[in-house]
Amino acid sequence: MAFLCKSNDNTKVSMEIEKSIKDDKRTFLGITQVLLLGAGESGKSTIFKQLKILQENGLWTTKELQEFSNTIYINIITQLQVLINAAESIGIQLQPENIQLSKDYLELNHSSVTWTKEIGENSVRLWNDSGIKSTFEKRDKEFQLNDSAEYFFNNLQRVTQDNYIPTPQDALRARVTTKGIIEADVTFDNINMKIIDVGGQRSQRRKWIHCFDKVSAVIYVAGLSEYDQALREDINVNKMDESLSLFKEICNSKWFDSSSIILFLNKKDMFIEKLKRVPFKTYDKKYTGENSFEAVSLHIQRKFESVKIDPNKKIYTHFTIAVDTENIEFVFKVIKKIIVGHVMDLV
């Protein structure tokens, strides 16, 4: 009987130790940090905003949505100004009745102007100008617009209404440069994560070093549709080349030896449309495959994954559409398992 008693005691101790280990793992998982990185305009901040929707079942408050209004108005003004300047540079004439209007519109200072009904009406009038429309068709080849420009141009009638309140989709597409470090605590299936979004422009990257401690995973976002675009900071540098170079640096960094590397090849929807207008061979002269999404996307995926030095390092790649909540929700469910599994292995 004494033997059985001792055995039961050992079993009890063993169970307590096991429980303690599980509790420690839960505690460790409770501070899981995920770093969201990528070059400027890759769409990573849009993915960050998606977390708000996923975390609260899409329940952005009316007040929170209204806060995006000014950003959207600024987006509209600046992008129409880009079109007006591009039309003049290319040599496309606007309709005679809109020439003076376009000059006045260029005088608007987006950083200080207050949106009015008149500005809204003038924005609609300019967007409907045949010369502006012709200029718009030459985007990417002659000049660059924000990814969300077409979306807001096509929704100008709604956006310029007096009682306008941005929709969640409007908020997702509102373009604002991330400066500094933004954090969000999110929970997926009882797993707590701290998502850290850091500005992707070159001037912001020096701040990344402060985020490298105890990172369980790095989500790197690269824009698929940017293969024919130049950096805003340096027009002599191709965006995809810059993104690839940056990913190589991150993938092989000593800081992330024990971190999961998750690659989001983003803007899949825009990439599919871009291929119809701009063949991939215009960027990669050595590419000899078909100009289809399947062929080119696989080529790009292999190109990114080939930069790792350690052959045993796993890169988890996903094709994403940052403005599609269902797509991001599905992807996050997949990567949650990757992150949790990776962290559990380390404990």
From Swiss-Prot:
Query: Which controlled-vocabulary keywords does the entry list?
Result: GTP-binding, Magnesium, Metal-binding, Nucleotide-binding, Transducer
Show the segment(s) annotated as G3 motif. Answer: 193-202
Q: Region labeled G1 motif — which residues?
A: 33-46
User: What are the GO cellular component annotations?
Assistant: cytoplasm; heterotrimeric G-protein complex
Q: Which GO terms describe its molecular function?
A: G protein-coupled receptor binding; G-protein beta/gamma-subunit complex binding; GTP binding; GTPase activity; metal ion binding
Name the Pfam families for this protein.
G-alpha (PF00503)
The keyword RNA-binding appears for this protein: no
UniProt binding sites for GTP: 38-45, 172-178, 197-201, 266-269, 322
CDD domains the record matches: G-alpha
Show where the G-alpha domain sits.
Answer: 30-347
One GO BP on record is: adenylate cyclase-modulating G protein-coupled receptor signaling pathway
Give each disulfide bond as a residue pair. Answer: none
- Origin, by domain of life? Eukaryota
Q: Where is this region: G4 motif?
A: 262-269
Chain positions covered by the region annotation G2 motif: 170-178
- Residues that bind Mg(2+), according to the entry? S45, T178
Q: Where is this region: G5 motif?
A: 320-325
Q: Summarize subunit and interaction data from the UniProt record for this chain.
A: G proteins are composed of 3 units; alpha, beta and gamma. The alpha chain contains the guanine nucleotide binding site.
Spell out the family assignment given in the record's similarity comment: Belongs to the G-alpha family.
Biological role stated in the UniProt entry:
Guanine nucleotide-binding proteins (G proteins) are involved as modulators or transducers in various transmembrane signaling systems. G alpha-6 is involved in the folic acid chemotaxis signal transduction pathway.
The molecule here is called: Guanine nucleotide-binding protein alpha-6 subunit
What's the source species for this entry?
A: Dictyostelium discoideum
